[in-house]
Amino acid sequence: MKIAIISDTHDNVPNLEKALAWMKDNNIGQLIHCGDLCAPAILAAVLAPNFAGPIHMVFGNVEDRELTLKKAEDFPRVRHYGDAGETEIAGKKMAFVHFPEKAKELAASGRYDFVFYGHTHQPWEETIEQTRLVNPGTLAGLFSKATFAVYDTATDKLELKILEQLL
């Protein structure tokens, strides 16, 4: 199964739509959003209607928490975890948060195969103990190119996708 990891969308609807179209064409089965989607209306109008699989989300630092949770309840495939989430997909334990400090703590715990995070808008990967710590960058393209990551559970391969190169 292929899993897309995105973060820091910051209401950039055109980039989100392009990424979602690519995900559909490339059989992405699940999506993890590491925060800063921003406007709750983006969840209801763009993200949830245009992604067929499960969507796992956490808060960033610029969301309307109450309204975002309310919108998420309208979509059975959307699970909002609050500030930190964890799931297991194809035998891989994954945690996801927005802030790098919390992500490093989770990675150091040794409980996860992957910890995903956002906030810095910079793609990054490192290994702490046996945990791969990954920042997919910013889908909005703020301060760097618009990027997201894809993890393939069948091949154990993680790739950074640069949005402008996919079009």
Indicate where each model-derived feature is located.
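Core catalytic region of metal-dependent phosphoesterases/phosphodiesterases
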Residues: K2-I89
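Conserved beta-sheet core of the metallophosphoesterase superfamily
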Residues: P54-H56, K93-A95, F99-L163
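Generic ordered-secondary-structure signal
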Residues: M1, A45-V46, V62, K70-E73, ...
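Conserved histidine-centered catalytic loops in small-molecule metabolism enzymes
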Residues: L167
